[in-house]
Amino acid sequence: DATVSNVVAILGCCMGGMYALKAVGGCRFERSCPFYGMVHVPEAWRGPGQGEPLDALATGDPESVLAVIGTADAWTPPGHVDDLEAAGATVLRYEGADHGFVHDASRPAHRAADAADAWRRVLDWLAG
C-alpha cells in the first residue's frame, strides 16, 4: 500500500539503527526510528571519524527519535538505553526481547506479537 506523508524519516536495525540515531544531527530527516541501534559505539567499531550517536542527538532534535529496544539485548544494555532517554529520545522497551526481535521472522529472537506491536506504534508515530 502506498502512503502519503509529509514526514521524511529514517529507520534502521542494529548498525543501521545506530546510524539512524546519528542522522538526527543532520538536516535530511525529520524523524528517526532506530530498531535496537547501539547508543554508544562498540569498542571494536571505534575509529577515526566514528562519532557517538548521543553527540548527534545533542546537535539535533532528540524528540524526533522513537527507538525500539529489547531489554535482553546485549548490544543495548539498560544503562545505554537510560542515556538515550536522558538525552530526550522516546524509547519503546520490550521486556525480555533480544537483538533482532522485530525485523526477521526466521531469527530465533523473533517475537511476533512484540514485532507487530512495535510496527504499529512506529507507524502511528510516523503518521502522527
Question: How should these model regions be labeled?
Answer:
Residues D1-G128:
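N-terminal cap/leader regions of alpha/beta-hydrolase-fold enzymes
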